[in-house]
Structure formats: structure tokens, C-alpha cells
Regions:
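Histidine-anchored nucleotide/phosphate-binding helix
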Residues: 2-14
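Reductase modules of NAD(P)H-dependent flavoproteins
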Residues: 18-129
Length: 129
């Protein structure tokens, strides 16, 4: 995930107090890339970094959630738009369509639509990887 590098850089800088909530969706628990790394970062920085895993199908013992990252999930995690809040999106086209609107051609960000637009975010607060 491209967000791993960003999260890692923020957390290793002791001066940076940015709070991060990672919502990580996958088909199954075995598809979760860098899970142990994210779990370790969450343990090392409990006041600054939180991670929640979402899967379509769970194995026994899975400690995350089964289902999609939908409007209710985003409303419960995001505190709403503010001048200092930013949302970073990475995923397949269906995720972009639902959450933020599709990316534009040749890597352009494209217009903001979907759940984040409904929640009041503007395109300066959302970055699509």
C-alpha cells in the first residue's frame, strides 16, 4: 500500500503529531498486506495511529470487521471536514467510485463525489493514489 510509506514517515518524526486512522479493506484476512507492520505501528503509537481491517470473508479468529467501508463507517471514524483534515484513498475503481469519485485521466485527481463529498469534504482535502 502506498500509504505505508506516508504513515511510517509521519510516525518516525517525533515532532509530527498528525493523527492517522487507516481503514484497510481486503477480500480475506490473508490478503492484508503489511498487517504485522501496521499492527506494530499501532502498538508503538496508540495515541497517534489506529488501524481497522475490513474483509469480505473472515477466517476464524479474525479480529477485524466483515463488510465494506461505507458511509456509516466513514462517519464514525472521520470527525468531519476541517482545515487540517485530509483523506487519502487507495484501492480498486469501485472504492474510488463509492468513496471519492473516480480518478481523472493520466493520474489527475478528478472531481470529488461519492461519500466524502456527501460528508462535506472538498477536493483539496482528498488525495486519490
Amino acid at each position: 500500500t502506498p500509504l505505508y510509506q506516508l504513515i511510517h514517515e509521519i510516525l518516525k518524526n517525533k515532532e509530527d503529531k498528525t493523527k492517522i486512522n487507516l481503514l484497510f479493506g481486503n477480500k480475506t484476512p490473508s490478503d492484508i498486506l503489511l498487517k504485522s507492520e501496521f499492527d506494530n505501528l499501532a502498538k508503538q503509537h496508540p495515541d497517534q495511529f489506529k488501524v481497522q481491517y475490513f474483509v469480505d470473508k473472515a477466517d476464524k479468529g479474525f479480529d477485524g470487521k466483515v463488510g465494506y467501508i461505507d458511509k456509516d463507517v466513514l462517519k464514525s471514524v472521520l470527525k468531519g471536514p476541517s482545515p487540517t483534515s485530509h483523506v487519502f484513498i487507495c484501492g480498486p475503481p469501485g472504492v474510488y467510485k463509492s468513496v471519492s469519485g473516480p480518478k481523472g485521466p493520466k493520474g489527475a485527481q478528478g472531481d470529488l463525489s461519492g461519500i466524502l463529498a456527501e460528508l462535506g469534504y472538498d477536493k483539496t482535502q482528498v488525495f486519490k493514489f
